[in-house]
A protein has these predicted regions:
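Conserved N-terminal phosphate-binding loop of PLP-dependent enzymes in the Aspartate aminotransferase
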Residues: 1-95
Length: 95
């Protein structure tokens, strides 16, 4: 779907996006320090990213170094695009 394809584009753009995985709208985005070793980013980086996203209106859960996106099943394309734009902008700033 659209969200997964946008996240895969971010994975290609940012070396620290180590993996994008999950079925349907239950998506995990793993952030790493090194794309080869897959060493996780630190908790401070994850916290900084979360707060930047919250400031822009995007809320998500994280489990250590994995962003857990679970948008509602009724999300519109416009809402999905806005969420992905916010996430991409915040990834550029926070990591």
């Amino acid at each position: 779907g659209y969200i997964t394809s946008r996240l895969k584009e971010m994975q290609d753009k940012f070396a620290f996006v180590g993996d994008v995985r999950g079925p349907g709208l239950a998506i995990g985005v793993e952030l790493v320090k090194d794309p080869v070793t897959k060493e996780p980013v630190d908790d401070t980086t994850m916290e900084r990213l979360l707060w930047r996203c919250v400031q822009h209106g995007l809320f998500y859960q994280n489990a250590h170094n994995v962003i857990k996106l679970k948008p509602p099943l009724i999300i519109t394309m416009e809402q999905a695009a806005e969420a992905m734009n916010i996430l991409e902008h915040c990834l550029e700033e926070a990591v």
